[in-house]
Structures are given as structure tokens and as C-alpha cells.
Amino acid sequence: MIKVEYKHTEIAVKKKLGQNFLTDRNITRKIVTESETNPDDTILEIGPGFGALTREISTITPRFTVVEKDPKLASFIRNEYPELTVIEGDFLTVDLKKIAGEKPLRVLGNIPYAITSPILFKLLENRHILLSATLMMQHEVALRITAKPRTKDYGILAVQMQAFCETKYLFRVGRKVFRPQPGVDSAVISMKPKVNDPVSDREGFSRFVRCAFHQRRKTLQNNLKKTYELDRVESSVLKQRAEELSIDEFFRLFEQIRPLMVSSADPES
């Protein structure tokens, strides 16, 4: 069992919570700077741990909200930062609209590797109350989120995130600045929701994207033919693979075939 102690508080590291604590203050300063946080923002920090990032945010504004699942760490943060609102629980079940109130949220966090995708999709679902999110995560996932067409990392995650948010890879973080040290490097990205939703049916678009990438090396024609009536679509784009399409091309194709879904089709099959 790995234990970490800080300011007379010791915890047994829980792998299922993805607990790797950042120790380099230069990096926390850089994260806060990149987030463009200002004193008037409604700020939410995901998983403060021992408060490395919390400390930097509090130099800008002493009052904000943090969500911490580990009871011992939640207690530690309450004692160290009495002006904060500490929500002890799972971020995935938290009501973000209640936290935001009348102002959009600026979210920061060193998020657990194991639940990175659920966190990202929760933020995506709540994008209308999101000002920005500046997040540290596994380096490989950061590359997948910010990937460009015709690259090996460009896939479902890139298209779904970039369709509704401006995403940016900010900087890499080596594994040696964490306790305990993870087996991979991390990276920090930013995501800012687009002003207007490019498609009205996000769930339908999501199904379409998953179907388009179902077998990565196959053409769109082959991946989509069981789900949509493609004989009614005149588009040379169907001869391409999903990884070759830009986000705008995904939008245009979706608008063409959206009404043509086969009623009995299962997009995941």
C-alpha cells in the first residue's frame, strides 16, 4: 500500500480514484495562468487532493468550489481553505447548474486517468454553462482530444470534443512531478465551448460519429451503409475514411444523412 503524507495528513493512495498528487508549483502556476482565471469568475476545481492547484487559484480568488471524493482529503481542504465550498462526493453526480448559478463555470483540475472520458462528456453535456475548462490528464488522451484529421490520434474523441468546443493542447507534464509517480506522462489542455451549437441533435451526431469510425480502416460507405440509406446520398466523401474528414465535413455529411437513418438499425453494431 502506497501512502502519501502532507502537513500531518496521511492517506493511503486509492488507485481507483487515480490519486497522483502534483508537487511542482511552477506547473500549478502555469495551469492557472493558462486558464485565464480572474477574481470575478465562478470557479470549480475537480479533485483538489492536497491542494496544489487550489493554492494557486486562491491567490486570485479565495472563494470558489471544489469537488473531492476522498473524505480525508475533503476534510484536509476544509481545514486549509475555510473560505472554499467543499463538495464531498463524485464529480460525475454533481449538479453543475446548481454550482454555476447565474454565471458560467470556469473549471480547472488534475483529473483522474480512469474517468477522464466520463468527466469530459459531463462537461460537454453542460457546455452551455461552461466558460472554459483547463484540465491535466494522461498525455495520450490529451493528444487524442486535440488531434487533427489524417493523424493516428484523430478519432471519435477528437471529433466529438472539437465539434462543440475549441480545444488546445497547452503543455506536457513529466511523470516525475507527481507523488506517487504514475507510469505515463500527463498534459494540460483547454476546452472552450463554441458560441453556437453547429448541430441541434448532439446525441444523433454522437451516434453518427461512432458509426463512422466503427472500423477505422474502412470507408464511410462501408461503415455507414447498415445504418443509413446511402443510395440517396450523392457525396464523394463517402469514399473516404472517417479519419480523413474535417469537423466541418462531418457536420455537412451528418446533415445530409441524418433523415436517412434506417429505423431498425443499431448504430453500434
Swiss-Prot record:
Mind telling me which GO cellular component terms the entry cites? cytosol
Per the entry, what this protein does is: Specifically dimethylates two adjacent adenosines (A1518 and A1519) in the loop of a conserved hairpin near the 3'-end of 16S rRNA in the 30S particle. May play a critical role in biogenesis of 30S subunits.
Q: Does the keyword Cell membrane apply?
A: no
Gene assigned in the entry: rsmA
Taxonomic path: Bacteria, Pseudomonadati, Chlorobiota, Chlorobiia, Chlorobiales
Could you say which protein family the record assigns here? Answer: Belongs to the class I-like SAM-binding methyltransferase superfamily. rRNA adenine N(6)-methyltransferase family. RsmA subfamily.
**Entries under InterPro entries matching the protein:** KsgA/Erm, rRNA_Ade_diMease-like_C, rRNA_Ade_Mease_Trfase_CS, rRNA_Ade_methylase_Trfase_N, rRNA_adenine_dimethylase, SAM-dependent_MTases_sf
Residues reported to bind S-adenosyl-L-methionine: 20, 22, 47, 68, 90, 110
Documented EC number(s): 2.1.1.182
For molecular function, the Gene Ontology terms on record are: 16S rRNA (adenine(1518)-N(6)/adenine(1519)-N(6))-dimethyltransferase activity; RNA binding
Q: What is this protein called?
A: Ribosomal RNA small subunit methyltransferase A
Q: Which domain of life is it from?
A: Bacteria
Q: Where in the cell is it found?
A: Cytoplasm
PROSITE patterns linked: RRNA_A_DIMETH (PS01131), SAM_RNA_A_N6_MT (PS51689)
**From which organism does this entry originate?**
Chlorobium phaeobacteroides (strain DSM 266 / SMG 266 / 2430)
| Catalytic activity, as annotated | adenosine(1518)/adenosine(1519) in 16S rRNA + 4 S-adenosyl-L-methionine = N(6)-dimethyladenosine(1518)/N(6)-dimethyladenosine(1519) in 16S rRNA + 4 S-adenosyl-L-homocysteine + 4 H(+)
